[in-house]
């Protein structure tokens, strides 16, 4: 053996080669051990994780089943309450029986889901059932819901009315949370109208209220919708404005000192021969455009002796750059635009309810231009209506104003001028006949209540009023119009009427 060993030739390169091979084998051996360890660990983790997630999935599934069972129990209780409510339903609530045609299904299922969400939200706010209390462990988990069901009749009543309101006003909401918030806004307004209408005829109240397309607005949305009227600098007024009496004297209609005592007791331009049905500005703050275009439409028809024709409010929104589009404006600047450009037909430049990036008036035929802008003082309104016709005015629109449904408005007004409308007439009526106007569609029961409430008063007292055309569609107010209280001379400035009055001169 020693002889064999002695015969081996141990060169330096050979020794180095053996060392390298040995090192390589050791490294590979360690790698193999690590790989095996990692593989075993991964397999173990995978197995453990699979077992865990499988068990967790089972737990979640069981929780989901429990939650679904709980929700079904709660909705079953709600359905019982709803059925009891249906037994005492009146004509106003018949909508509960009708199908609510939208993607979410029929009215009853939608109503139940909304009531369930509402009830759950209320339960979270005032939780009288402590589930962590040992003494409550064996109590039915629907206890807290049944505890609050006694008060659900009112919610069912208001919710059924809200669903009817949604359908009538084509309301669609993003999700149930928004729908519940809109419901709360609606309920506040609905209760306000009911309380107001109970008092109609008392304390001088001569108008009734009703929920409408704005009744689901929040207070912030109300404030954003009504923008302060843009002011007009004196240099523009002096350049373009012609005072009413000067205009009438120039056209030989009257002498400059003509007095209002010569005028009739009433003047009404609401006839179909003067106007198309009132239009709807939608959620765009473009009342100034509708007032100005409405004024121009009357002037165009009256001057040319034609039937009513619709002109473009959208052109004013897009092209009258002195105004702020859907963020407010002033009819004066719309008339100023008409002086320099002309007006498009409504069919050629239709209303969109929002401001476009570009003015597209090159696409339409520009018809008659305005040459000057007339100005009316507060004590000249009756004179203006008799000699030149309708005029644009500004009012201080308030929540009372928005909820107006019929009668002669004498409610609270906003001290700030924030809404442009068209003054189309004036009149007077005995107090007992305040709701007998042919344009009024007030419920006969409210008229009866009004007459009962004014008993003992001097029902022969005369109520004087303005007739105003709004831009909230024909379903608002009295066919799209509102009658606003005034004094006999028409110069009291109630609700801002008379503070900012213009008309176009053709």
UniProtKB/Swiss-Prot annotation:
Glycosylation sites: 133, 258, 418
GO molecular function: cysteine-type peptidase activity
Keywords for this protein: Disulfide bond, Glycoprotein, Hydrolase, Membrane, Protease, Signal-anchor, Thiol protease, Transmembrane, Transmembrane helix, Zymogen
Topology within the bilayer: Single-pass type II membrane protein
Function: Cysteine protease.
Annotated family: Belongs to the peptidase C1 family.
EC number: 3.4.22.-
SMART domains: Inhibitor_I29, Pept_C1
Entry GO terms, CC: membrane
Native organism: Plasmodium vinckei
Record topological domains on the Lumenal side: 54-506
Name by which UniProt lists this protein: Vinckepain-1
Positions annotated as active site in the UniProt record: 287, 419, 470
Transmembrane residue ranges: 33-53
Top-level taxon of the source organism: Eukaryota
Annotated S-S bridges: 284-326, 319-359, 344-364, 413-495
GO biological process, one term: proteolysis
Matching Gene3D superfamilies: Cysteine proteinases
Compartment(s) where it occurs, according to its Swiss-Prot or TrEMBL record: Membrane
Major site of localization recorded for this protein: membrane
